Swiss-Prot record:
Residues 275-722 are annotated as: Pocket. The C-terminal domain (743-867) is required for binding of RPD3I and RBAP1. It is found in: Nucleus. The keyword Cell wall biogenesis/degradation does not apply. Residues 541-552 have a biased composition (Polar residues). Interacts with RPD3I, RBAP1, the Arabidopsis cyclin CYCD3-1, the mastrevirus replication-associated protein A (RepA) and the begomovirus replication-associated protein (Rep). Keywords: Cell cycle, Host-virus interaction, Nucleus, Repressor, Transcription, Transcription regulation. It comes from Zea mays. This is Retinoblastoma-related protein 1. Pfam families: DUF3452, RB_A, RB_B.
């Protein structure tokens, strides 16, 4: 750890990497303790049963051996899969050397060792079966462990078949090694003390006390229901602060975890939970069995697709894969590049790890590319793959997505997103175009990796795609000319995407097969002039909790965006990745930018629909869900500049409060924020630091950020007031009128979010049929004129005019009695259909099921009256 660059420019990234490392080792130590307790009894040697640590000495010995193994295999601390392989190797050594009397099982009929050979139990194969590890990698870890033991204790490894120790009875000893005196009673204590001294000396040189992680893992909270699909930083910071300081005491962390109830004690059989370790090992098994067996070059069918283009693209594709993956997983560059990416390639032990990840990513890329080619040819609108297969941006996005999935599979902590984007010259908006297609065309993708891609897409949609330098603005300036001036004023346009030669020059190496003239730039595809490049961004930590969704085709376009004859057509990928100014090859007069922006906005609306519904449920105003959604949709379509350099949750919060003010609900901004903090995606900076422009300080433009109240009053209200006022102009509740379709007033109407769980009415008694529905707003509230309302916010305000919040007994009583439940806030495409978010939402409890944009028809008249 001391080798990390302590400069301020990299301190934030280093802090996150250290926290991720603590989280990785915490997960590994939990796995190790659980596996050890399944294989061995609690008390070993002459350890005092009342020992303050409650850690069996054999367990402690194995943990120290694992830490020593790290010195020979740095990849153990790079990703969770490698870490587990090292720990399973340690368990194998303990099973070979620890006396059989300390085992918690017998060889005969054991459920732990089920793999058999003619000579007995196959120990290594059984462990690989139990923990989903690779037998080849496990044997490699065992070999490195043997070398570490020889160096530390000056012992020579002997063949177990020659020594024939008693504790290996009925175990096939072929290829097993044995160390005499390693764990014998007479020398075990001295060996353990020697290991502890070595670990303590190494801890003093670094910043973390790795030994304490084994003891502290019961103190660090852990959610057994966590899917573990991405690195969990929720509690690692607390652990890091404790473990990084040698002065912190740990005696309050030594509680022994209680065992789950057994059926004999009245409990039920516990179902195995998906933990970060089981998730990582399951996805690693998929990568090993499905992807690793593939060739590391294009298949014959893919070569046929590539050679059938206007020119043979096979060599260009393979060359690009080599260059781009070398940029992501550097193996030949200097140590300086390694530090910038968190990958210290100066260490020779890192090169095999990076090479292995490159091979896995390339195989996955070729597999998905072939599947996409097959699917595109089945599209009636595509008869030539040349535009797609010659598009540089498409290939880079597909390679970057493959590399990110490989990193996610191994649960790596040394390269954190968006490092993949920075290495390849892509932007978040670029990557968002490929994720849905990647999931659709890789049918064997495990559920956990689909969840990871869902979480990644949420990050891209909610904020990263709206950052300065995103290629989103290069498409917006074409699709929405009205925002061009604001984009240019703020300098939001992306830089051109760097060519492959630029990537090679960054690597400071010469890739075999490149032209001898580096100044001749390789074509970046047909949209070279518009290809953007992402500026550097700070690493965003991954979500802890995500929800799997089924990626579906985008909803049909609005009439003002595309002709009616094209609504049902599926746009090919070449339309998505083509230059924004190119005409859509499907037909019509629209540009490819129109297609791209429409698809992107439809995804934004789907994500916003789920988050709005969840937040409205939390604040108990479900009846206003559609109004909030409609205001958000109108802002996205007509006041798109409000999203520039911002997070969509900032607009959702403001829309909810604006609707609450218009409808005179008893809801304050403080209540909204308190409930928002309970959402899984919540980050404090979302409502505490919002961009509202730049100021000139001594000739330097400095971004100005304010709190959400200031943003709401100064920026949001002036822009969104017409949409909020239009809610009042629509008149009374729809159920009090007869709609155009002839629906009877007051009759039930399908919910605008029909597949989402309805919070009203709610059953409040388990023994009686008693239901409670939210109180409707009175007609009097809706008939109030706009001039009598205040659109502005103040934290701590009363819910009614001239009334103190302390006297609002109804609101206080409601908050006291509300039993809030955790609502899943992740994007789930199964829950909201495309037709719902495409504009076919109906009014709650009545009204037409037509496009809700009709509710804003008198918008222009309303603006005139207000002005």
């Amino acid at each position: 750890m001391s080798s990390l660059d302590p400069s301020p420019a990299t301190s934030t990234q280093q802090q996150k990497q250290l926290e991720s490392l603590v989280n990785l080792l915490t997960q590994g130590s939990r796995f190790y303790r659980k596996a050890y307790n399944e294989l061995f009894s609690g008390v070993t040697t002459e350890q005092d049963p009342d020992s303050s640590t409650n850690i069996p000495e054999y367990m402690l010995f194995g943990w120290h051996l694992f830490l020593m193994l790290h010195l020979r295999s740095p990849e153990l601390f790079k990703d969770l899969v490698s870490c587990i392989h090292g720990l399973v190797a340690v368990l194998a050594i303990l099973l070979i050397h620890v006396p059989a009397k300390f085992r918690s099982f017998t060889i005969e009929g054991s459920s732990h060792l089920i793999k058999q050979t003619e000579k007995g139990v196959d120990l290594i194969a059984s462990l690989c079966h139990n923990y989903h590890t690779s037998e080849e990698r496990l044997k490699e870890m065992l070999h490195k462990s043997h070398n570490a033991i020889e160096d530390i204790f000056h012992m020579k490894a002997l063949s177990a078949s020659e020594c024939k120790p008693e504790n290996l009875d009925k175990i096939d000893t072929d290829d097993l090694m044995y160390f005499k005196g390693l764990i014998d009673m007479e020398c075990f204590q001295s060996n353990l003390e020697k290991m502890e001294k070595l670990c303590n000396s190494n801890s003093c040189k670094g910043e973390l006390d790795f030994k304490s992680i084994l003891i502290n893992n019961d103190y660090i909270p852990y959610d057994e229901n966590s899917t573990g699909d991405s690195t969990n930083l929720g509690h690692s910071k607390c652990a890091f602060e404790t473990l990084a300081s040698p002065t912190k005491t740990i005696k309050n962390m030594l509680t022994v975890p209680s065992s789950p109830l057994s059926p004999a004690t009245g409990g039920s059989v516990k179902i195995v939970q998906m933990t970060p370790v089981t998730s990582a090992m399951t996805t690693a098994k998929w990568l090993r069995e499905v992807i690793s067996s593939l060739p590391d070059k294009p298949s014959s069918k893919l070569q046929q697709f590539l050679s059938s283009c206007d020119r043979d693209l096979t060599n260009a594709v393979t060359e690009r894969v080599s260059i781009v993956l070398e940029a992501i997983f550097p193996t030949k560059s200097s140590a300086n590049r390694g530090v910038s990416l968190g990958l210290n390639c100066a260490n020779a032990f890192d090169i095999p790890w990076a090479e292995a990840r490159k091979v896995e990513a390339s195989k996955l890329y070729y597999r998905v590319l072939e599947a996409i080619c097959r699917a595109e040819l089945q599209n009636s609108n595509v008869n030539n793959l040349t535009p797609l297969l010659s598009n540089e941006r498409f290939h880079r996005c597909l390679i970057a997505c493959s590399a990110d999935l490989v990193l996610a599979t191994h649960k790596t902590v040394i390269m954190m997103f968006p490092a993949v984007l920075e290495s390849t010259g892509l932007t978040a908006f670029d990557l968002s175009k490929i994720i849905e297609n990647f999931v659709r065309h890789e049918e064997t993708l495990p559920r956990e990796l689909k969840r990871h891609l869902n979480s990644l897409e949420e990050q891209l949609l909610e904020s990263m795609a709206w950052e300065k330098g995103s290629s989103l603005y290069n498409s917006l300036i074409v699709a929405r000319p009205s925002v061009a001036s604001e984009i240019n004023r703020l300098g939001l346009l992306a830089e051109p995407m760097p060519s492959l030669d630029d990537l090679v020059s960054r690597q400071n190496v010469r890739i075999e097969g490149l032209p001898a003239t580096p100044s001749k730039k390789r074509a970046a595809g047909p949209d070279d002039n518009a290809d953007p490049r992402s500026p550097k961004r700070s690493c965003n930590e991954s979500r802890n909790t995500v929800v799997e969704r089924n990626l579906q085709t985008p909803p049909p376009k609005q009439s003002h965006m595309v002709s009616t004859s094209l609504k049902a057509k599926c746009h090919p990928l070449q339309s998505t990745f083509a230059s924004p100014t190119v005409c859509n090859p499907v037909g019509g007069n629209e540009k490819c930018a129109d297609v791209t922006i429409h698809i992107f906005f439809s995804k934004i609306l789907k994500l916003a629909a789920i988050r709005i519904r969840n937040l409205c449920e939390r604040v108990q105003c479900v009846e206003q869900t559609e109004r909030v959604y409609n205001v958000f949709k109108q802002i996205l379509e007509q006041q798109t500049t409000l999203f520039f350099n911002r997070h969509i949750d900032q607009l959702i919060l403001c829309c909810l409060y604006g609707v609450a003010k218009v409808c005179q609900l008893e809801l304050t901004f403080r209540e909204i924020l308190n409930n928002y903090k309970r959402e899984a995606q919540c980050k404090p900076e979302v409502f505490s630091s919002i961009y509202i422009g730049s100021t000139n300080r001594n000739g330097v433009l400095v971004s100005r950020h304010v709190g959400i109240i200031t943003f709401y009053n100064e920026v949001f209200v002036p822009a969104a007031k017409p949409f909020l006022v239009s809610l009042i102009s629509s008149g009374t509740h729809p159920e009090d009128k007869k709609n155009a379709s002839g629906q009877i007033p007051g009759s039930p109407k399908p919910s605008p979010f029909p597949n989402l769980p309805d919070m009203s009415p709610k059953k409040v008694s388990a023994s009686h049929n008693v239901y409670v529905s939210p109180l409707r707003q009175t007609k009097l509230d809706l008939l109030l004129s706009p001039s009598s309302r205040s659109f502005y916010a103040c934290i701590g305000e009363g819910t009614h005019a001239y009334q103190s919040p302390s006297k609002d007994l109804a609101a206080i009583n409601s908050r006291l009695n509300y039993n809030g439940r955790k609502v899943n806030s992740r994007l789930n495409f199964d829950m909201v259909s495309d037709s719902v978010v495409a504009g076919s939402l109906g009014q709650i409890n009545g009204g037409s099921t037509s496009d809700p944009a009709a509710a804003f028809s008198p918008l222009s008249k309303k603006r005139e009256t207000d002005t």
